[in-house]
Amino acid sequence: MSDQYVISRRSALGVIGAGSAAAALAACSTSNSNGGGGSDSSKRDDYSGEVKLEKFDTSAGNYEPATREHPAKNVPKPIKPDNLNDKSVEGFYQNIAFLVAGMQYISMTADGSALKESNIKNKEQVSTLEEQMKSSGAPDKSWSEDFTVKASLDTPQPKIEGDNYTWEGKLSINLGSFMVRDGQAIDIPEKSRHQEMPYTFTGTYKDGTWEIDLKPKTSASSGASGGASTGSGSGGGFGF
């Protein structure tokens, strides 16, 4: 694989990891009116399993998966949840869902607008990430067949300590069977197509909004599911 292409993917994931977008880069709608008030309330008892965002903007047209000839077309854009700033387990969950969906969107389109609407820590670095990805050829000259980012949660509910919420989970990445770099298709070895790593999702609620931070659990084995690595520095990233 092209080093420049791989670095841009790693950097994209580094933005999510630990709020340390700067470290990753060095390695290469309205809110609900209930806002911050009141006690925590959940819409359901069990949030464990895959994190899913419910709403996407599909107005660009029918989605067309990537081929060896062209990148994915009309990629659905994540829609910011109305309750993104609610102080609740549901609000925290929706922040994780929107952030991860935004991460996939920027990885497929080099458009960070969804991430800029999220409450990710250090999101001022997203513009730099966009520039870096575009300089590497994304999305018109560099893409992968089936790039997906998914998060899952290990427990039904997060740990809550005052305004600080913590959820243990996993982040998984799928690249598909090939990537394209400068118009040239390159097969991806099967062992490198899917990677999964334990992550800690944290949220701090302050002044009516969340600050979301995602950190890889660097103490875990780096060989999980295809040789994922933790990257270097605070917050690491997702190595390929």
Could you tell me what each predicted segment is?
Residues 9-13:
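N-terminal export leaders
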Residues 67-145:
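Core segments of small alpha/beta cavity-forming domains
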